[in-house]
Amino acid sequence: MWLPLLLGALLWAVLWLLRDRQSLPASNAFVFITGCDSGFGRLLALQLDQRGFRVLASCLTPSGAEDLQRVASSRLHTTLLDITDPQSVQQAAKWVEMHVKEAGLFGLVNNAGVAGIIGPTPWLTRDDFQRVLNVNTMGPIGVTLALLPLLQQARGRVINITSVLGRLAANGGGYCVSKFGLEAFSDSLRRDVAHFGIRVSIVEPGFFRTPVTNLESLEKTLQACWARLPPATQAHYGGAFLTKYLKMQQRIMNLICDPDLTKVSRCLEHALTARHPRTRYSPGWDAKLLWLPASYLPASLVDAVLTWVLPKPAQAVY
């Protein structure tokens, strides 16, 4: 009885692997990538440039654009883009249209993102959440909507970089909220544009060493957040809480942050070049073995584990 089931599962796995490895012919199609100053965006831009794609890379800063242009081929073009500014997005869309012309846009990679303040929710303000949502959620939505006509023209692909923290909210702050929102947008977009030949993939990296996970930056923002708290709130948590929280954060980041960014860029490249791109990619050992399995566990169990890991406030009653 079990043998036919086992053979059937094995056959399915082999067929899936064969299908997953089918690639499109070599292409010089246009791909637009946001957030190419550093990290995943910069690495992907250079990889695609080497493969012959015509890369249109957007950077937030002039120095980021200049550094990228210096090491890339003449096929790669850069522009400045602030994805939180609707006028900047429209200007970038016109710039892309000027380059692609009748060919259309084959690929859009929404990569730009920020961490914001990672810390206890009661420490934060509405503006703290809004700033992160503007970059990580509303930014990609605005860029995607502005470029949809060009993507439809080429029957192109949208790749949105979210996070495993868009599947499991492991900490407070706007980051998890923003990534959950981008996941939902991507799922609904995928179904809505499939009729027009546009494919949508989500890449959910685990923890990697990028500017978003820079410990010095994360610690500075949380210390500034603590300093602005009312004395009563500081008393609830106690002076030792911040020190314990930062030490815990440092231990976790040093343990699980992967320095190999190519694990992510390879997934992004596959989503652009595979004949049958996956709906979701989860690069990183921690994503596959820790965060995604945990997202399917009962919420009460996940709550218990995370509550045990995080330090307790001085005046905790539970």
Swiss-Prot record:
Tissue expression pattern: Widely expressed. In the eye, abundant in the retinal pigment epithelium.
Side of membrane Cytoplasmic, spans: 310-318
Topological category with respect to the lipid bilayer: Multi-pass membrane protein
Role, per record: Catalyzes the oxidation of cis-isomers of retinol, including 11-cis-, 9-cis-, and 13-cis-retinol in an NAD-dependent manner. Has no activity towards all-trans retinal. Plays a significant role in 11-cis retinol oxidation in the retinal pigment epithelium cells (RPE). Also recognizes steroids (androsterone, androstanediol) as its substrates.
Residue positions with a glycan: 160
Main localisation: endoplasmic reticulum
Active-site residue list: 175
EC number: 1.1.1.209, 1.1.1.315, 1.1.1.53
Reported impact of residue 157 to W: In FALBI; decreased stability
One of the GO BP terms on file: retinoid metabolic process
pH-activity dependence text: Optimum pH is 7.5-8.0 for 9-cis retinol dehydrogenase activity.
Subcellular location: Endoplasmic reticulum membrane
Effect of residue 238 to W: In FALBI; decreased stability; loss of 11-cis retinol dehydrogenase activity; accumulates in the perinuclear region
Keyword Endoplasmic reticulum assigned: yes
The protein's name: Retinol dehydrogenase 5
Record note on domains: The last 8 amino acids of the C-terminal tail are important for a proper localization as well as for the in vivo enzymatic activity.
Residues the record lists as binding substrate: 163
Organism: Homo sapiens
Pathway given in the UniProt record: Cofactor metabolism; retinol metabolism
GO molecular function: 11-cis-retinol dehydrogenase; all-trans-retinol dehydrogenase (NAD+) activity; androstan-3-alpha,17-beta-diol dehydrogenase (NAD+) activity; androsterone dehydrogenase [NAD(P)+] activity; protein homodimerization activity
InterPro entries: NAD(P)-bd_dom_sf, SDR_fam
